[in-house]
């Protein structure tokens, strides 16, 4: 019998649940809105129980790639909990524990962005690399990745969307929308920040709108910081805002300008190599749930070892 794995991409607006082994083998998939914890978790459990019945019990483990903040430390008493999220009703929910107890299966758990990064490392834009980052720019801004073949963990998990970047209030008097920090990266450059600043959602703004030069500048400032601190071999930019493909050439031009020759690496210095350095995700919208399946594979097979 083929060993199968369950994945849950737990998003703030929707859950995606799937069963399979990887991008070329997804046996079943379902999507439903994220409502209350009780209803949402119940629907996830029903999906996997139904698949277990159909497959004769072939699911070995479940992986969860969740919105956050979360506690991803297996040694912590609150491992698998969603912690200080602003989403009403979801604070301190033991998501991993509810799934583990409901299905009696091992559970792997991490942030949604670390999950997407993991999937891109195994099957997508960062395949073959051991140090890279994945930044998603959409309703919020979040980041994850791998350093030396290990997911970025430590005190908690990366909160790349909440770094502080230079904000010239004369050029951009917008105060920012982050309820915690105001004008952090997410407060200035997320999709809702663009809409609040310009009075229209990003998808309604034409490519020549001044919003995009400012957006590229803010994202390039963040990437310059990440390049200097993490030295990634590749940077993957996903999320709804990055569907504006004209942002990529703007960002690729702005990052070397900001670094000003200090980082002597060909992907930074060579315009052609830069095209392969700052890239969109290969797996697209499937990266999150595929990352969850990868977390499940790891939980079932080698929970105490590096994941790549």
Where are these regions (language model features)?
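Short beta-strand segments
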Residues: 9, 63-67, 134-140, 144
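General beta-strand structural signal in soluble alpha/beta enzymes
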Residues: 107-111, 115
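Adenylate-forming
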Residues: 116-122, 143-145, 164
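ATP-binding/phosphotransfer module of carbohydrate and carboxylate kinases, centering on a glycine-rich
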Residues: 1-61, 70-78, 97-107, 119-131, ...
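A charged helix-plus-loop insertion that forms the helical arch/lid used to bind
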Residues: 76-92
